[in-house]
């Protein structure tokens, strides 16, 4: 069982989906097909040249 957390583009709610058993990826709240993988809240520091 692979559970993944996504954020809906239309309503903005976080959705947890089982990708192995689900054929169609949709938001269960609004029915939107556009889901984004949320980025981690860790700030990255890049060394300037």
From Swiss-Prot:
For this protein, the record's InterPro entries field holds: RNAP_P/RPABC4, RPABC4/Spt4, Rpo12
Q: How is the cofactor bound?
A: Binds 1 zinc ion.
Which Gene Ontology terms describe the biological processes this protein takes part in? DNA-templated transcription
Q: Which HAMAP family does the record match to this protein?
A: RNApol_arch_Rpo12 (MF_00615)
Q: Which family does it belong to?
A: Belongs to the archaeal Rpo12/eukaryotic RPC10 RNA polymerase subunit family.
Role description:
DNA-dependent RNA polymerase (RNAP) catalyzes the transcription of DNA into RNA using the four ribonucleoside triphosphates as substrates.
What name does the UniProt record give this protein? DNA-directed RNA polymerase subunit Rpo12
What's the source species for this entry? Thermococcus onnurineus (strain NA1)
UniProt lists the gene as: rpo12
């Amino acid at each position: 069982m692979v559970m993944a957390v996504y954020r809906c583009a239309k309503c903005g709610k976080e959705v947890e989906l089982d990708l192995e058993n689900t054929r169609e990826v949709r938001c269960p709240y609004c029915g939107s097909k556009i889901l984004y993988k949320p980025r981690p809240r860790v700030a990255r520091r890049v060394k300037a040249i």
